[in-house]
Amino acid sequence: YLETVVRHHTSGRLKVAPEHTEERVLALMRKPPFALFERLNDDFRSICRSNGLNYQLIPYFISSHPGCTERDMQALAGKVLGRLHFTLEQVQDLTPTPMTLSSVMFYTGENPYTGEKVYVARSQEEKRRQKSYFFRRKR
């Protein structure tokens, strides 16, 4: 299926939304493990190589999601910018929207399913620091 999508329905850039790399944050987002994105990335590159395509996979990530700390963003940067060598283009701070689990956690500071406290980056400075990890250069 992926090969059909890449070869016949992609115009050069395939945008996907893994949203984060850290399992704890992904669990709060109700997203699958990051290993699935890594597998998709490997398969995408393999398909492009075998078909002579110079296509790009464009991942979308979120900063300041409830449960996400600066340490999580540092780990994300290490995996995505370092190990996988992506240059990120799409960066979004969490924007709370009505009727979503993420918004409930943002406003209450807890996971409604477990009652567990969840860290929330609330100040502009906390959000700026988290987002800054997307654009840090390797030294």
What is the role of each PLM region?
Residues Y1-D93:
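Conserved AdoMet/S-adenosylmethionine-binding subsite of the radical SAM
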